[in-house]
Amino acid sequence: MSDVPANQLFDAYFMAAPMRAVFSDRGRLQGMLDFEAALARAEARTGVVPATAVAPIEAACRAELYDPLALAEAVATAGNSAIPLVKALGRQVAAGDAEAERYVHLGATSQDAMDSGLVLQLRRALALLEQDLQRLAEVLADQAERHADTPLAGRTWLQHATPVTLGMKLAGLLGALTRHRQRLRELRPRLLVLQFGGASGTLAALGEQALPVAAALAEELGLALPEQPWHTQRDRLVEFASVLGLVAGSLGKFGRDVSLLMQTEAGEVFEPAGAGRGGSSTMPHKRNPVSSAVLIAAATRAPGLVSTLFAAMPQEHERSLGLWHAEWETLPELCCLVAGALQQAIGLLEGLEVDAQRMRRNLGLTHGLVLAEAVSIALARRIGREAAHHLVEQCCRRAVEQRRELRAVLGEEARVSAELSGDELDRLLDPAHYLGQARAWVERALAEHHALGFEPHPA
């Protein structure tokens, strides 16, 4: 039996092994079998089936007893994975106790087993995601605090703007992760609910015992009992997928920024170095942003997967034709992609290399122009905004045309020196003195991160 998806050549790069195991063949089958075992226990508790039927059914509810290849061939004609699995389960039970076989899957429908099994998988997936988000947030918090006062060029439209700090850039991602963690925490009780409605959602086959069985089944599985079955109401799954799309997008933005800062012309930060990491098959000098590539790839693929789940929402009546089927591989792939991106982001940040000297040197590439705003604002307080803007703009133009430092041009301009001393100009043109509220933003992001805390859930 396969414990991981078959596409291992690329999955090891793009996906995290623990999440791949959750959605492996074994993981999928075990989720449905856990539902079937819990159903037998719940029906025995409520007197629907004899207590003697429970042990034989439970003993047969182990994924390793079943051949996924044989089941896969049967799925091709059955239309879903639960039908051949329940048949195989019945045969397995009958081999040990023919009487107990009569009570397998009693009152349930295929989608009950598949959806409840999926929710059990998602519980494990959610725990893994929350753990990795917490770890990534902790590493981010440490790095943001460490570099709260490390100046580098802010970039707007990919051009140098005014100085910012590396800590502020990292705190931006930390704030996004805090919000994503809040979203996952809020949706958890909505997502982790039982699916149990029988043929058309009424549980008519169980008569007056329907609600007692449903309540007992939810308790057995540790899931909430929803207001009614949700066979064709898929908002819970789509909400979860949407948050994963947000996580992927935030990580992709970070990967994009890191890769741009790693460009030869910038050289301000680098992914961790290591033997064989980020090399080229032809150019020995290359140090490619291989982790950033995973973050960007996940952010590129995730919107399409989320879109598929949105497109699958208008499901027909009480059981969908094709739209439900479109979910089966889409949501697991999204979970695996986001988990892989989180793992890569953690490794990237834990070993992030920062060249603060190169950052300061790059700030000087425009010969002081990135601090022109600081001078303009200081002059505006004395000669008015428009006059100050016009004067500094003229000085900037001369500095560019003459390829000189803005400080020198400003010092020679009588209208400037009449208002600002040399010491004042030096201070205004020092990036460290024009960082605004960058440190405050870092501190606020750190405070929100620490206030959220962590609520561990077993995977």
UniProtKB/Swiss-Prot annotation:
Localization: Cytoplasm
Q: Which reaction does it catalyse?
A: 2-(carboxymethyl)-5-oxo-2,5-dihydro-2-furoate = 3-carboxy-cis,cis-muconate + H(+)
One function term, GO molecular function aspect: lyase activity
Query: What keyword terms does UniProt attach to this protein?
Result: Aromatic hydrocarbons catabolism, Cytoplasm, Isomerase
Record keyword Transcription present: no
A biological process term (GO) from this entry: beta-ketoadipate pathway
A GO CC annotation given for this chain? cytoplasm
Q: How does it assemble?
A: Homotetramer.
Which NCBIfam families would you find in this protein's record? PRK09053.1, protocat_pcaB
> What is the name of this protein?
3-carboxy-cis,cis-muconate cycloisomerase
